């Protein structure tokens, strides 16, 4: 199975000094609002992604926890990473919405991760909808947010 250029770029850049940081900002740059959370990609491979953000003043709300929208940005980035790393090269994806459950106050360093099976994008027909699960944990390993991101999958147009 052939995967996209984003995964190849990650695999090359992670070996370089500051490569993960540079890759993180390059990936987020394509959806500039993601830059507001200053994400760092921990890992990206077919079936799995992990991305971290630190709590700071710019992403806090009035009760000094990480703002819900910042957490959703983290969720969206983790989903995008695992989708890019896992989807076959002849398909494309588009997020259509997310169902989010806030379980605890989101404070400190947060890590979003997503795991999907190898057969995840093997739909009976295209286009079709899949749900990508994303879990957000704090530095103590406690899940603070859980989300299912609805993703529309279709074949790339022929060139």
Kindly label every feature range from the protein language model.
Residues 1-52:
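Non-catalytic linker/capping segments at the edges of enzyme domains
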């Amino acid at each position: 199975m052939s995967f996209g250029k984003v995964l190849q770029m990650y695999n090359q850049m992670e070996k370089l000094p500051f490569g993960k940081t540079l890759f993180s900002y390059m990936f987020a740059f394509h959806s500039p609002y993601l830059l507001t959370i200053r994400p760092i990609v921990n890992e990206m491979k077919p079936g799995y992604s992990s991305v971290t953000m630190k709590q700071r003043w710019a992403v806090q709300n009035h009760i000094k926890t990480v703002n819900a929208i910042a957490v959703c940005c983290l969720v969206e980035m983790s989903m995008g990473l695992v989708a890019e790393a896992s989807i076959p090269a002849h398909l494309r994806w588009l997020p259509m919405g997310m169902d989010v459950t806030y379980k605890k106050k989101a404070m400190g360093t947060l890590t979003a991760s997503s795991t999907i099976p190898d057969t995840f994008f093997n739909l009976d027909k295209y286009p079709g909808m899949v749900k990508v699960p994303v879990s957000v944990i704090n530095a103590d390993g406690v899940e603070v947010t859980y989300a299912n991101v609805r993703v529309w999958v279709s074949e790339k147009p022929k060139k």
